[in-house]
Amino acid sequence: MSFIPDTTTLIQFAIATVILAITPGPDMTLFVSRTLSQGRATGFASMAGALCGTLIHTTLVVVGVSALIVASPMAFFVLKVFGAGYLVFLAWQALARGSAFSPEKKSGPQISLFRSWAAGLGVNLLNPKIILFFMTFLPQFVSAHDPNAPGKLFFLGVMFIVLSIPVTAPMVFAAEKFSTAMKASPRVTRVVDYLFAGVFSAFALKILTAQAK
């Protein structure tokens, strides 16, 4: 079919995708932290939201909206501020609610699956670095002169999502196993809360320093 790249391109793209999928980022930090604090279902909901954000970014690249955002200094700056601010909010949540699974807080507040999905969506959708990434990553595998380029770009974006699932899902299961051990140690639990808060804050700072190129 005309919208499917050749086999060599697909193999190269698959290898690159797997390598990128295991690279830590704000989205991975989110669904691992949500799994630790709220359980496996919440972790998968966050992961699903992040993948939906990836699909939206793919669509924006295909229709050219991402290029317009990067070309507009004001739009790019606003997106950076909102994206960084959202990660700071998640850092605060990690401290305020992160230890909700500890023995002393069994009746603590639970985050709904929809809110976890929305959090995952927000982490990817408000991250300008993802816009820059998809604008530079996907086009490497499609010729600019190919009349079927839009269809191939979208196909590769969907392929990126499909290949990411079996790579990232085991991390949720691993986090669930780790949370069982953490329940016996409130002190370790709190250390992990601060760890995730620090990681979210670091990613927020990284987003603020992103430059449109």
Language model: regions and residue ranges:
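Selective transmembrane alpha-helices of multi-pass membrane proteins
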Residues: 71-100, 167-171, 179-213
